[in-house]
């Protein structure tokens, strides 16, 4: 792809997300979502392969359907309330349709089937954009309309997302599909708390973005797309293997890593609101995600292909390409748990 085209698409992604974030009118928020969708499709089809083209078409169809529902619900809300302000969606039917449309855009269950298939068919860096940057704009709309949402609907979406996100990743061997199912489960955690404590959703989103970007960058640097390809990564790049291990354990929510913080705070808020059964179901669903994270770690650290002793020293001679954001993102995704009291105070 031409550097000029890549620059235009990247700036369009930034413009679309910024428009949605700062907009207080439904039409401009919708325009931002559309710019985002149209800008990411050329990045998804960059390899000019039939699989990437198929994935881009699937993504476009899902996003176009969701955008149509968003626009229809905004018009329906305006016709009954005479309000185009983004944060005011007082009509119950419009709120229901808006929630369903945003769930489709985020890949929440039961509208999640496109996420693993699309992620698997595109390059790692395009998958990183799909599972990180493309989540910001829909969640910002969720944040703005959070007082008008239906709690029962959110509970159904979040529980099914966390359970199916964990269940779907159990028998996967493709790393992109595993990260896609991980994204579905994390979106479920963000959805359940957005009505009770919206600030926790933003905190969870930031930490999820840091961890997922770290994983994709390291996998792209090592050209790893399958679990068995990680078994030789320890010989080639021991630091990358350590980063993958820490990031996966953090995504699984194990203390004392950063990923434990949002799960801890969300469960605490749910218990404070007497949603103890819901908190228990979310906590148990995390074990499913943790299982396939541990499977990756086991395959990459405790199993190796038979090799001569000289190959075990390759990491010392391997030409490492330094990617500057990786160390910073690793620290954010692994070592911020001691700062939990500060985040509680700020929120």
Curated annotation (Swiss-Prot):
Main location: mitochondrion
Keyword Mitochondrion (UniProt): yes
Membrane topology according to the record: Multi-pass membrane protein
Top-level class of the enzyme under EC nomenclature: translocase
One GO location term (cellular component): mitochondrial inner membrane
Keyword Transmembrane applies: yes
InterPro entries referenced in this protein's UniProt entry, alphabetically: Complex_I_Subunit_2 (IPR050175), NADH_DH_su2_C (IPR010933), NADH_UbQ_OxRdtase_chain2 (IPR003917), ND/Mrp_TM (IPR001750)
EC code: 7.1.1.2
One GO process term, biological-process aspect: mitochondrial respiratory chain complex I assembly
Keyword tags: Electron transport, Membrane, Mitochondrion, Mitochondrion inner membrane, NAD, Respiratory chain, Translocase, Transmembrane, Transmembrane helix, Transport, Ubiquinone
Transmembrane segments: 2-22, 25-45, 56-76, 96-116, 122-142, 149-169, 178-197, 202-219, 241-261, 278-298, 323-343
UniProt catalytic activity: a ubiquinone + NADH + 5 H(+)(in) = a ubiquinol + NAD(+) + 4 H(+)(out)
Stored Pfam families: NADH_dehy_S2_C (PF06444), Proton_antipo_M (PF00361)
An example molecular function term from Gene Ontology annotations: NADH dehydrogenase (ubiquinone) activity
Subcellular locations according to the entry: Mitochondrion inner membrane
Protein family per UniProt: Belongs to the complex I subunit 2 family.
UniProt subunit comment: Core subunit of respiratory chain NADH dehydrogenase (Complex I) which is composed of 45 different subunits. Interacts with TMEM242.
Function: Core subunit of the mitochondrial membrane respiratory chain NADH dehydrogenase (Complex I) which catalyzes electron transfer from NADH through the respiratory chain, using ubiquinone as an electron acceptor. Essential for the catalytic activity and assembly of complex I.
Name assigned to this protein: NADH-ubiquinone oxidoreductase chain 2
Taxonomic lineage from the root: Eukaryota, Metazoa, Chordata, Craniata, Vertebrata
């Amino acid at each position: 792809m031409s550097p000029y085209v890549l620059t235009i698409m990247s700036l369009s992604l930034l413009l679309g997300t910024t428009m949605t974030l700062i907009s207080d009118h439904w039409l401009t928020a919708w325009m931002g979502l559309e710019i985002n969708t149209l800008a990411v499709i050329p990045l998804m089809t960059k390899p000019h392969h039939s699989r990437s083209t198929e994935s881009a078409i699937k993504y476009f169809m899902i996003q176009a359907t969701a955008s149509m529902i968003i626009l229809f619900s905004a018009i329906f809300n305006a016709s009954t309330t005479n309000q185009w302000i983004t944060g005011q969606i007082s009509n119950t039917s419009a709120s229901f349709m808006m929630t369903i449309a945003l769930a489709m855009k985020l890949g929440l269950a039961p509208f999640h089937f496109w996420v693993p298939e699309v992620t698997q068919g595109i390059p790692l860096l395009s998958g990183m954009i799909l599972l990180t940057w493309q989540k910001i704009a829909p969640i910002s709309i969720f944040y703005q309309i959070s007082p008008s949402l239906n709690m029962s609907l959110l509970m159904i979406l979040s529980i099914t997302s966390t359970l199916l996100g964990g269940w779907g990743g159990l028998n996967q061997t493709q790393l992109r599909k595993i990260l896609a199912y991980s994204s579905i489960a994390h979106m479920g955690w963000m959805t359940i708390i957005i009505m009770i404590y919206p600030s926790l959703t933003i905190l969870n989103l930031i930490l999820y973005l840091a961890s997922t970007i770290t994983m994709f960058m390291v996998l792209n640097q090592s050209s790893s797309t399958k679990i068995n390809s990680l078994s030789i990564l320890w010989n080639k790049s021991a630091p990358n293997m350590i980063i993958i291990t820490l990031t996966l354990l953090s995504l699984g929510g194990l203390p004392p890593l950063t990923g434990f913080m949002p799960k801890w705070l969300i469960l605490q808020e749910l218990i404070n609101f007497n949603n103890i059964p819901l908190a228990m179901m979310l906590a148990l669903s995390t074990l499913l995600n943790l299982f396939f994270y541990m499977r990756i770690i086991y395959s990459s650290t405790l199993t190796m292909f038979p090799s001569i002793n000289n190959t075990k020293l390759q990491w010392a001679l391997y030409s490492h390409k330094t990617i500057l954001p990786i160390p910073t993102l690793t620290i954010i995704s692994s070592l911020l748990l001691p700062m939990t009291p500060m985040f509680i105070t700020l929120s």
